[in-house]
């Protein structure tokens, strides 16, 4: 199945892209996808808390993805 991934902030800068298109196995969950993204980052996202949104709605870790879903990895907002 094809999934579009939107990257923001630290994820965007670490991966060097604001959007990825991946082909994943059916039954992949958001937590499995997060693990894959962290592996692609070679440890640079270790310790970074990420929120996951599927089709523009925050989703639990074990949400099963479907073909054509848009997934966003959103680090916490920081500011002063």
Model-derived regions, located:
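Ubiquitin-like/PB1-type beta-grasp interaction modules and other compact soluble beta-rich domains
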Residues: 1-79
């Amino acid at each position: 199945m094809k999934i579009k991934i939107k990257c923001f902030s630290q994820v965007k800068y670490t991966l060097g892209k604001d959007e990825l298109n991946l082909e994943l196995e059916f039954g992949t969950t958001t937590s499995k996808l997060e693990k894959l993204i962290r592996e692609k980052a070679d440890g640079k996202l270790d310790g970074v808390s990420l929120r996951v949104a599927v089709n523009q709605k925050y989703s639990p870790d074990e949400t099963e993805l479907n073909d054509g879903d848009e997934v966003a990895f959103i680090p916490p907002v920081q500011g002063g």
